[in-house]
Design a protein with these regions (language model features):
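Beta-strand elements of well-folded, non-transmembrane domains
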Residues: 101-107, 126-128
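Short Gly/Pro-enriched turn/cap motifs at secondary-structure boundaries
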Residues: 73-75, 114-117
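A solvent-exposed, acidic/Ser-Thr-rich amphipathic alpha-helical stretch
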Residues: 29-102
Length: 160
C-alpha cells in the first residue's frame, strides 16, 4: 500500500468513526446500528451487542433512559484521539485509538468541569462493502479510566 492509499484509508475510517459518534451524540444513536454489518458486534466493557437488532435495541434503551430517568446522562460528547489504521487486505482494516466520553445529566449547555466519564481503548475491525461503504464488523471500547459515574453503555448489565 503506497502513502496515498494509506492516507485515503485512514481518512475513510476516521470519517466512519466520527460520523458514528456524531450520530450517537447528536441523534441519540437512533441510526447507529446502520454503521455495522448485519451481524456486527458492539462491545463496551463486559457488554456485547451482536447484530443490528441488538445494537438498535441498546440505543433505544439508552435514549429512553435519557428521557425517563432522573439521573441519566442527557448530554454526551465522544472525542476520538490517536487513531491508528492498519490495512488487513483490500476490503478490511483494523482501527485502534482512544475514545474520551463526556456526559452530563442536564441538557446542553452543561456546566461541567469534571473529567471524562470514561476513557477507553478503541479497537475496530472494519469491512468495505461494495454497496454500503466501510462498516464495523466489530467496534470495541475497553475501559481504561472510569469516573464514579458509569456511562449508560457500562451501567446496563446485559449478563443478567
Amino acid at each position: 500500500m503506497n502513502t496515498h492509499e494509506e492516507v485515503m484509508l485512514w481518512h475513510a475510517l476516521y470519517q466512519l468513526e466520527t460520523r458514528y459518534w456524531h450520530e450517537v451524540d447528536a441523534n441519540g444513536g437512533r441510526n447507529a446500528h446502520e454503521f455495522y454489518l448485519p451481524d456486527g458486534l458492539m462491545v463496551v466493557g463486559h457488554n456485547r451487542f451482536q447484530g443490528r437488532d441488538k445494537i438498535k435495541e441498546f440505543y433505544t434503551w439508552r435514549e429512553r433512559q435519557a428521557v425517563t430517568a432522573i439521573s441519566s446522562v442527557k448530554t454526551t460528547r465522544h472525542l476520538i484521539n490517536n487513531l491508528f489504521v492498519e490495512s488487513s487486505g483490500d476490503s478490511a482494516a483494523r482501527v485502534l485509538g482512544i475514545v474520551s466520553f463526556y456526559g452530563a445529566v442536564v441538557r446542553a449547555p452543561a456546566p461541567q468541569s469534571k473529567p471524562p466519564m470514561l476513557i477507553a481503548d478503541l479497537m475496530n475491525d472494519c469491512v468495505l462493502d461494495a454497496d454500503s461503504g466501510w462498516q464495523f464488523k466489530s467496534h470495541t471500547l475497553q475501559p481504561i479510566f472510569m469516573s464514579h459515574e458509569a456511562p449508560p453503555s457500562i451501567a446496563i448489565d446485559t449478563r443478567r
